Amino acid sequence: MNKQGNTYTFLYSVVLVVVVAALLSIVSLSLQPRQNENRENEKRQNILSAIHISSTAENSAELFGKYIKEQFIVNTQGEKIEGNAFNVNIEKQYNLPVEKRELPVFVADVDGATKYILPIYGAGLWGPIWGYISLDDNKNTVYGTFFDHQGETPGLGAEITTPKFNEEFRNKQIFSGNQLVGIEVIKGGNATGANQVDAISGGTITSKGVESMIKNYLTYYEPFLKQR
């Protein structure tokens, strides 16, 4: 075959593309277990953060097993359903009709006190925001939160990840009597109510996104939260 001809060049290019694609596929498959492990460790760390437990990729599995005593899924009627709570993808659930969503519940024991940890997901200014909120045994008082985001503005909306902002939610109440009210994020440093926290300066839209995210997801969990 003429190595200077178009046919040779074409066949050579095809073979090269196939070989490179095969190598990339092999590399991707070999890395997948490690990538899955990293995602699971990060998820454990985030859940633990909502109950004020610091962890690393190296010890997150151990600490998760130490503090998380039970995990299960409920539906929007508050009924337990079959499934693995840890494996539920909240981002995918967010796009399903509400009545079809699976709602994970993680039950922790912190110094002998029961805490309920619930995942939450919503929209910020520039993209999705998500996190976890933990409640005391009364399913009303906030024990802790963890928030993260995809693309909020550094120094503004991205401040939802800071300990300062998260600490504001501690000991706030999500119910007023028997009515679910969520947590109101107030602009201007005027948060004095039992269910109010201060908004991030310059990050009003993201702050309101956090407020909506918490209220919406707690509404899905409301039948479960009202079980005593």
Please tell me what each predicted stretch does.
Residues 2-228:
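Flexible, solvent-exposed loop/hinge segments and secondary-structure transition points
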